[in-house]
From Swiss-Prot:
It comes from Rickettsia prowazekii (strain Madrid E). This is tRNA dimethylallyltransferase. Transmembrane segments: none annotated. Residues 36-39, 160-164 are annotated as: Interaction with substrate tRNA. The keyword Cell inner membrane does not apply. The keyword ATP-binding applies. It holds the Pfam family IPPT.
Length: 311
């Protein structure tokens, strides 16, 4: 059986993924699927630089800005939605292009995931409330009695993993690590992935990061986050990790000047981009790497990609 192909266009923030993907989609009548964990939320298209906020064309974009921040969502739910969209697009005879920089989503989509059952929102709330009441150390002590294997592998200071392990045991009666040792499930085993990694020269990347944040701050991002603050409680948007939200909230609360908020957001964006480059460099082995250090070289990338797609 000949496997169908999927293009994944990945790389650090502000590396030009959306621009290149848009041009490829126009040239080849492709459809674009989001693979960024923050661009799924409909309340924050500006601060996340959502391409459907930027491009107004007939190109089909999927899984962008479709979800409210209060809706229950998980990486497994994302994978199932993405797989459904990919299959629908290929049935129509078109090529799907996935664009984003969330390494976890890309890794699990390409290489498979441990099939841990979904945790109900009610149970998740119960465990979070328990944690808020008793704290990390006591929750870790309870986990040790229920799941001694997990307690030896999870530090009591690692709140996220601690809560997750406790949730999984309460839901399944099994250690979370029993799922880790089981064979991984590949949701798209009948597809081939062609991974293209955009890797700009560091100085050029940092420049584009700064320019993007400057543009975002001028492009009504302040109003967007002010509305978020007005419509939702801090608990409801605490899980939003997009750079710029925390800094704008500090500005709105009078704790930072606007210039200081922008400077901090730019610094954090550069740090985030550096971490993304490190992750993609070491975690994704089978990939095509496209490097550039100027706008002129960046313009040549499209021609290179068109050649790759023809090969």
């Amino acid at each position: 059986m000949i496997k169908k192909e999927i293009i994944i266009l990945c790389g650090p923030t502000a590396s030009g993924k959306s621009c290149l993907g848009h041009e490829l989609a126009k040239a080849y009548d492709c459809e674009i699927i989001n693979i960024d964990s923050m661009q799924v939320y409909k309340e924050i298209p500006i601060i996340t630089a959502s391409p459907i906020q930027i491009y107004n064309t007939d190109i089909h974009y999927h899984l962008y800005n479709f979800l409210s921040i209060t809706e229950d969502f998980s990486v497994i739910k994302y994978l199932k939605l993405a797989a459904k969209k990919i299959k629908e697009i290929t049935v129509r005879g078109k090529l799907p292009i996935l664009i984003g920089g969330t390494g976890l989503y890309i890794n699990l989509l390409v290489f498979g995931y441990n099939n841990i059952p979904d945790i109900s929102e009610d149970l998740r709330v119960q465990v979070r409330n328990l944690h808020d009441k008793i704290g990390n150390i006591e929750l870790w002590n309870q986990l040790k009695k229920l799941d001694p294997i997990a307690s030896t592998k999870i530090n009591h200071c690692d709140t996220q993993r601690l809560i997750r392990a406790y949730e999984v045991f309460m839901h399944t009666g099994k250690s979370i690590f029993s799922f880790h040792t089981a064979p991984k499930e590949r949701i798209l085993s009948d597809f081939n992935f062609k991974i293209i990694f955009l890797n700009p020269e560091r100085k050029f990347l940092y420049k584009t990061c700064d320019e993007r944040l400057d543009k975002i701050f001028k492009d009504k991002a302040i109003d967007e986050i002010a509305l978020l603050k007005k419509q939702f409680t801090p608990e409801e948007y605490a899980h939003l990790k997009a750079v710029g939200i925390k800094e704008i909230l500090a500005y709105l609360d009078g704790n930072l000047t606007l210039d200081a908020a922008l400077n901090v957001a730019q610094m954090r964006t550069r740090q985030y981009a550096k971490r993304q480059v490190t992750w993609f460099t070491h975690q994704i082995q089978d990939k095509t790497i496209l490097e550039y250090s100027t706008q002129e070289e960046f313009a040549q990338i499209l021609r290179h990609l068109l050649f790759i797609l023809r090969s």
